């Protein structure tokens, strides 16, 4: 299993990660948002998925630079014990609160974040208000954390308690604040938490949980097997 960083619709990043997954016989790529597939009507990455032969299954949690309203109209299918949206053949979106079970891993998804550049974007064309999770979605996320006790969580942004170095006050942004509330209030602490949004490859430990920022444009993280130590490295 590979955890891929922000791709922003860059075809070469998808091709590099696909190539590595094939070489290493990894059947699944989990992507941490700002995916870029179907961001615009003409999408070369969607065309790539429609024509590629074989390769891993891709699953994204969605980021702030993704077309949430469109994605939520795509066909719903069952995958790994949960329901996801099929964006293209072999390419899926796991909406907020989706739980998927892969072998011994229970993986809980919760995408979205706030765009700091939304003043430069066009509503309904390059920015969508659904980028930010609602109160009810955070409530569902908390309840899923308590009920299902996932060992892996996948989000686009990270809780405030993760010391990510980035411009701006993350404590004033609704999504990292909401994620922090869920993490701090839940009695369950996942073993690993993968996220993107911050465009660098790094890791931290907060309490019992390893947090891993998965990088940008072809960078990725991978835990060896179903357990063991975390490995983080870029694809070049």
Regions picked out by a protein language model, each given a short descriptive name:
Residues 1-2, 98-109, 152, 205-211:
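Beta-strand-turn-beta hairpins that frame and shape the catalytic cleft
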Residues 3, 28-32, 152-156, 194:
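Structural motif
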Residues 4, 9-102, 178, 185-186, ...:
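Core catalytic region of metal-dependent phosphoesterases/phosphodiesterases
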Residues 8-15, 36-41, 64-72, 99-100, ...:
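Active-site environment of divalent metal-dependent phosphoester hydrolases
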Residues 50, 57-61, 81-85, 89, ...:
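Conserved beta-sheet core of the metallophosphoesterase superfamily
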Residues 82, 103-171:
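Active-site-proximal loop/helix segment associated with metal-binding centers of metalloenzymes
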Residues 96, 112, 124-125, 214-216:
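Active-site donor-binding loop signature of nucleotide-sugar glycosyltransferases
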């Amino acid at each position: 299993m590979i955890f891929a960083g922000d791709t922003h619709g860059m075809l070469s990043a998808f091709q590099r990660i696909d190539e590595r997954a094939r070489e290493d016989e990894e059947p699944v790529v989990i992507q941490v948002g700002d995916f870029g597939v179907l961001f615009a009507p003409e999408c070369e990455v969607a065309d790539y998925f429609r024509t590629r032969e074989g390769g891993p299954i891709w699953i994204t949690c969605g980021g702030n630079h993704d077309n949430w309203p469109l994605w939520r109209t795509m066909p719903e299918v069952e995958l790994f014990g949960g329901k996801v949206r099929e964006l293209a053949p072999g390419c899926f979106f796991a909406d907020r609160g989706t739980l998927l079970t892969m072998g011994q891993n229970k993986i809980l998804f919760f995408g979205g974040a706030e765009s700091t550049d939304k003043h430069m974007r066009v509503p309904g064309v390059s920015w969508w208000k659904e980028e930010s999770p609602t109160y009810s979605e955070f409530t569902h996320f908390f309840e899923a954390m308590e009920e299902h006790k996932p060992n892996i969580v996948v989000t686009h942004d990270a809780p405030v308690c993760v010391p990510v170095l980035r411009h701006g006050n993350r404590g004033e942004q609704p999504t990292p604040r909401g994620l922090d509330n869920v993490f701090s209030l839940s009695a369950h602490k996942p073993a690993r938490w993968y996220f993107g949004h911050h465009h660098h490859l790094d890791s931290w430990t907060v309490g019992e949980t390893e947090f891993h920022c998965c990088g940008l444009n072809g960078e990725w993280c991978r835990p060896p097997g179903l357990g063991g130590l975390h490995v983080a490295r870029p694809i070049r």
